[in-house]
Amino acid sequence: MSINVTEIVLHQIHQTEGETSELNTVLRDNLLAISPEVEQMMLQLHQAYQSKAKAYGIFKNESIFAQQLNRLLEQETDFLPFSHSCAKMLSSELAKYPFASGGTFILCRYNFLATDYLFIALIDSRTSMLVDDQLEIKRTEYLDITQYDIACRINLTELKINAQSNRYLTFIKGRVGRKIADFFMDFLSAEEGLNPQLQNQTLLQAVSDYCDQGELSAPQTREVKKQVFEYCKGQINSGEEIALSELSEALPTLNEVDFAQFTQEQEYGLEENIPPVRNALKTLTKYSGSGKGVTISFNADLLGERLIWDELNDTLTIKGLPANLRDQLARNK
C-alpha cells in the first residue's frame, strides 16, 4: 500500500545543558522536498502508529491549536507558519513536564487509502555505529521511527465531513508514570472523545443481554459469543473496526429482532463502528482471574465439563489437569 505525502516539515526541540536546562526550538525555514525516502519514512511512521494503543479525543471550544488548524484548512495560512506555531506551542507545553527531553518534531499532511491525515510526532534520536568506506568505525545518529510514544494524528477527512465526530483525533497512550496522554491533551487543548474500552465492554454486555432475551441455553449462548469473537478477531487481524451492522448479520435473529435492532431499542449507546480492544473481547470465550497467588484461565466451553463451579462452596474443580502442571506437581510432592 502506498502513501501520498503532500506536505512535511521537521523542526528540532532540544534541551540545553547547564544548571537550569531549558528547551530551545530550532525551526526549519522551508518544507521538505517530497522524495521516495520521505514517503518511505512516513509509511513506516504510519504503520508503527497503526500498531500502537491509542486514545480518542476532541478539541475543546477554546483550543488554540484547533483555531490554527482551521486557518490552515481554510487556506488562511500556509503549512510552514502553521508548523512554526505548533512547534512553539509544543515546546512551551513540554517544558512543564519532568520527562521533557526534546527531539525531532515532525508534522506531515498525507493521504492513505483515500483519507487525509495530519500526523504530529516528537521522535527521539538514537546513537549507533557504522562502518565507512575506509572500514573505519564511526558513531552515527538516527531517528527511532518505530519506537515512539509522543504522537497524535488528526483524520482531516472525518473532521471535514463531521465536525461533531468524537473520533477524528487520536493520540498514543503514554507509558505508566509518564503522563504522555495528559501532555498531548494539553498541547492540543483537547478532551476525551470516544472510549473504545467502554464501547467494547458495552458491546459484550449487549451480546449477553441479547442471548438472555432470546432465552438461549448456556451452550447456545456460548456459541453466539464464539461467533462474536471470531468476527471481532477477523476485524483485528485485518486492521478494521467492528461494524455493528456486519456483526448483526453474522448473528442469529432472536424473537424476530436482530442484534443491531436490539441494541438500538435498548439504547446501549454503541457506535456503528467500534475500535476493537483485544483484551476486552477475550472474555467472550475465556474465563480468567488472579488473586492470592493463583492465576486461572480457561476456555468458556470447558465450564460444566472439565471445570465444575460450586458457587455455594466457592470452589472450582478441575477434571484432567494439564500434563505439564501434573508433572510439576509430581516432581515437587
Curated annotation (Swiss-Prot):
Pfam families from the UniProt entry: NA37
Cell compartments where the protein resides: Cytoplasm, Nucleoid
Main subcellular location: cytoplasm
GO molecular function annotations of the record: double-stranded DNA binding; single-stranded RNA binding
Superkingdom classification of source: Bacteria
Keywords of this entry: Cytoplasm
An annotated GO cellular component: bacterial nucleoid
Similarity remark: Belongs to the YejK family.
Protein name (Swiss-Prot/TrEMBL): Nucleoid-associated protein APL_0429
